[in-house]
């Protein structure tokens, strides 16, 4: 009786393997360039035609191969990078499976020319559809040249899934950008249809990033250097204003290998969570180093995912490393990153004179609709008060006297206050820059950081109500409240069941006194209802704290006097992450003198 299970022929198994390894032209480039880097090259030249369909050619200056090794390289699972199973847990190379070359050769017309260092001649091999057709001696420079023509010529079904030439060329460019950033010591050249797309000379990391991602972005990157024993996190991170709508600019590397790992991405987003609105992604170039035996890279065909032995430690180290830079908000405090190119010249004396003239004009301009009666603020003067009390965080009122006595000259305290616009924005001058501060966002950040510190110390200030208030809750809201009653108590709420669907509210967080705290409580319960089984109260804590902070501070039009502005600025200088509110919105924006002059065609 004939068997139904058959051993597949080698050419078919190679095509199946190619389906996992070779998804598109960029996949071919990835495997070939990684081999070149493993070979110790100092230069890689990548050329493609028709998006990689017609030709992919990779030339490197690596160690090259002998005739015997070149032939073995086209056999499945033949590699020089591992010899035993223990080597899988101490990998120091990008490639190791020995699948790439035979898989690529099985779906293309493949040519390999190589010459080992010190050899007097090279070897050239031609294969078609995985079968070696010709082997001969050749003359060439030391290194390796691989040409892949007519990709997927024998698998027409795969060709149907190929995109346009421009799209495929774009994928190749993105892939090469990732690889080139990982090795700034290696020259990378990328040519598409005879046109040079980029030429990245060997340089330091900042210069390499400037070449590939643009000098404007490079100017907004700040260095990172964090170590926790054998675990290290280094690289460059951008200020929040450079955020993107997708994760395309998360350049993350584990031991030099580009990865798209959920643990790493979550750590990055957690660090930036208070700086960006939801749905935005930062720009980071991170190099994470861990002992080779602490990470498994053999868990995905494309090696883009890894598995850490101590996942939590790696996550926390990445988050702590990023927060160590973000906490200082260097882009606000003028701690400019070193530039790989010349800075613009300083403003001329004439420009400075024009700034003074503009400021003098602004001081005289005071339409009642938008500004307070007096626009200029002498050090001891105050704005003319409008009718009604100003709602400020408690800390601001308590610290008024102290802030007058302090000699702190942080960034915010060093600003020269011009006035208040629409009783919602504080206008300041910083040298020749015009700085606009959203007073609500600033108060919100101060209140949030204070509340977070109080919660961590179990010392949230609570304000007991003179008369308890009743609140009617749905069955679902009531169940949520019972489940999280203790946590809400730590937040400063005191509630007890009154009967049926009615609850008594006896106390609220002190920050919320004088506000619509019932609405805030309902919003928190709604937030808790969306947690689900996969999340805990701790996961939603920062969202809840930011909601309380937002509801507790001044909103809309609220005039502030000079003492109140000084107190706010002193608090901002003492507050971490002060450039953004807890929801990620910016606290301040700056207009440089050249930008203002361009507005007026100067």
Curated annotation (Swiss-Prot):
> InterPro entries, alphabetically?
DNA_mismatch_repair_CS, DNA_mismatch_repair_MutL, DNA_mismatch_S5_2-like, HATPase_C_sf, MutL/Mlh/PMS, MutL/Mlh/Pms-like, MutL_C, MutL_C_dimsub
What CDD domains does the entry give? Answer: HATPase_MutL-MLH-PMS-like, MutL_Trans
Gene from which this protein is expressed? mutL
MF (Gene Ontology): ATP binding; ATP hydrolysis activity; ATP-dependent DNA damage sensor activity; mismatched DNA binding
Enumerate the UniProt keywords alphabetically.
Answer: DNA damage, DNA repair
Name of the protein: DNA mismatch repair protein MutL
Which Gene Ontology cellular component terms are annotated?
A: mismatch repair complex
Q: Which Pfam families match?
A: DNA_mis_repair (PF01119), HATPase_c (PF02518), MutL_C (PF08676)
What are its GO biological-process terms? mismatch repair
Q: Which PROSITE patterns match?
A: DNA_MISMATCH_REPAIR_1
Q: Does the keyword DNA damage feature in the UniProt annotation? A: yes
Q: Which domain of life is it from?
A: Bacteria
What does the record give as the function of this protein? This protein is involved in the repair of mismatches in DNA. It is required for dam-dependent methyl-directed DNA mismatch repair. May act as a 'molecular matchmaker', a protein that promotes the formation of a stable complex between two or more DNA-binding proteins in an ATP-dependent manner without itself being part of a final effector complex.
Q: State the family named in the UniProt similarity comment for this chain.
A: Belongs to the DNA mismatch repair MutL/HexB family.
Keyword Membrane belongs to the record = no
Q: Which SMART domains match?
A: DNA_mis_repair (SM01340), MutL_C (SM00853)
